[in-house]
Amino acid sequence: MDGLGQRVLVIAFDGWNDAGEAASAAVSHLRAAGEYESVFSVDPELYFDYQYTRPQIRMEADGSRELVWPDATLWRPPYRAEGSRLWLLTGVEPARAWQAFAAELVDAALSEDITGIVALGSMMSDVPHTRPISIFSGSDNEQLRTALGVERPTYEGPVGILSVLGAAAEEAGIPTIALWASVPQYVAGYSPSPKATLALIDRLVEISGAEVDRGQLPAEALAWEASIDAAAADDEEMTEYIHQLEAARDTWDSPEASGDAIAQEFEKYLRRGGEGHGKPGRDDPRR
């Protein structure tokens, strides 16, 4: 197997796997950049709790209103004679029947001859907004890890729908990789997070070979970072916290840093009142 192949399905879901809306915004950006057509949607009555995920009223251009139900939809890209193509799967994390939900969507992927899957997720982490957004790239598929040079996940614990879909896809013979962006936890009020969205798309392009127009994302990422800088400038406690995170991140990233130096830096960070749980941006409760 040579990587993901040329018919790649990119997955993101609203909800638990989507801190700062970074993952869902990445798929929305991809869809807006191309002429996609819907090829499959699940029956919302089977999978969603409308008291938890309510239908929405949307205004149309002519002034009429449309009732929109929560869903999960597979989108097909326009035809290209050469190069990788990106199918999209996006929607709301289901409230029930996850195994049936995953089986339906994997069957739809097989009907589209999908050769590989990339699941996008994002999580709140103890990382600074002033540094590059870290992306964890992991796969349970040994051949894919070798081909792409990504890590093997070691997390044990509760998971989201991305993990369930990934396991079902692997069982069906579709190699799957997960990309997780670390979103600074102190910027929860600054969603969406275009810097994290851009980092996910950049990494997706690296591993898939697909061509993606970034559009206004780079400018939006800079504006997002500047808005947080401005907020921190008026908040001494926030500024100090960011400096602590920067020191921890810089120590971790330093090529000459020894294991002891890294441990000492994190001990100092924790003594100052940080609530980190290990490497910055690498502890992922959803992998």
Annotate each predicted stretch with a short phrase.
Residues 84, 92-143, 165:
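Internal, conserved structured core segments that host functional sites
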Residues 11-12, 90-91, 119-120, 180-182:
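Short beta-strand segments
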Residues 21-25, 96, 100, 156, ...:
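Conserved active-site and cofactor/substrate-binding residues in soluble primary-metabolism enzymes
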Residues 13-17, 89-98, 148-156, 187-191:
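Flexible, glycine/proline-enriched loop segments at strand-loop-helix junctions
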Residues 1-91:
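N-terminal short beta-loop-beta anion/metal-coordinating cradle
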Residues 126-207, 211:
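Catalytic cores of processing enzymes, dominated by hydrolases/peptidases
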